[in-house]
UniProtKB/Swiss-Prot annotation:
Family the entry assigns: Belongs to the germin family.
Keyword Manganese: yes
Function statement: May play a role in plant defense. Probably has no oxalate oxidase activity even if the active site is conserved.
InterPro entries: Cupin_1, Germin, Germin_Mn-BS, RmlC-like_jellyroll, RmlC_Cupin_sf
PROSITE patterns, per database record: GERMIN
Lineage: Eukaryota, Viridiplantae, Streptophyta, Embryophyta, Tracheophyta
UniProt protein name: Putative germin-like protein 3-4
Cross-referenced Pfam families: Cupin_1
Record-annotated Cupin type-1 domain positions: 67-219
GO MF term (any one): manganese ion binding
Subunit field text: Oligomer (believed to be a pentamer but probably hexamer).
Gene3D superfamilies in the record: Jelly Rolls
Binding positions (Mn(2+)): H116, H118, E123, H165
Length: 229
């Protein structure tokens, strides 16, 4: 009985210690800031994991505010029928070191934000208008499970860091969503463009073997992405 009690006690202590570390494990992907703000000097030649700071005296109030995503772009500007207005550190230097960024995405009817991955951030989004099919694909060890739901205006969704996902406008009118990331530079890997539009190209035999299709199919798909996104 005494041995069993000691075993249970040790287990409880282990769980408590693990929970105490939880905030460290789930904190933002970017490093914590060491000052109130560090407005990115995008012209600096200093190489760091992020951007060097402008002198505080050179940073006006405007670095705290942006109207860039107040309006969207042309949804017919590319074959996907969508337009992404980015608000990461390159577009909003004030978020440098703060571990946040945003995007606005507008969709034509039938438009899509193709399957892609954000390797450095979790994504949280809200649909402002229209209705979007949001799809998320789990990892291989989770059985490649596909999760999806039609998300309507005022509803939200979350994309775990690194998982493949997409959005598709299933409505008859244009749709808009705004998403935020826990990184100033979440990165993006578009799956179709990565496979068939890389620079230099992935060797065709590799894709033929991996996708289990004929050479002609791979060459056709490559021809669709020669101009990029």
């Amino acid at each position: 009985m005494e041995h069993s009690f000691k075993t249970i006690t040790a287990g409880v202590v282990f769980v408590v210690l693990l929970l105490q570390q939880a905030p460290v494990l789930i904190r933002a992907t970017d490093a914590d800031p060491l000052q109130d703000f560090c407005v990115a000097d995008l012209d600096s030649k200093v190489t760091v994991n992020g951007h060097a700071c402008k002198p505080a005296s050179a940073a006006g109030d405007e670095f705290l505010f942006s109207s860039k995503i107040a309006t969207g772009g042309d949804v017919n500007a590319n074959p996907n029928g969508s337009n992404v207005t980015e608000l990461d550190v390159a577009e909003w230097p004030g978020v440098n070191t703060l571990g946040v960024s945003m995007n606005r995405v507008d969709f034509a009817p039938g438009g899509t934000n193709p399957p892609h991955v954000h390797p450095r951030a979790t994504e949280v989004g809200i649909v402002l208008r229209g209705e979007l099919l949001v799809g998320i694909i789990g990892t291989l060890d989770m059985g490649n499970r596909y999760y999806s739901k039609v998300v309507r205006a005022g509803e939200t969704f979350v994309i775990p860091r690194g998982l493949m996902h997409f959005q598709f406008n299933v409505g008859k009118t244009e749709a808009t969503m705004v998403v935020s990331f826990n990184s100033q530079n979440p990165g993006i890997v578009f799956v179709p463009l990565t496979l068939f539009g890389s620079n230099p190209p992935i060797p065709t035999p590799v894709l033929v073997k991996a996708l289990r299709v004929d050479t002609g199919v791979v060459e056709l798909l490559k021809s669709k992405f020669t101009g990029g996104y």
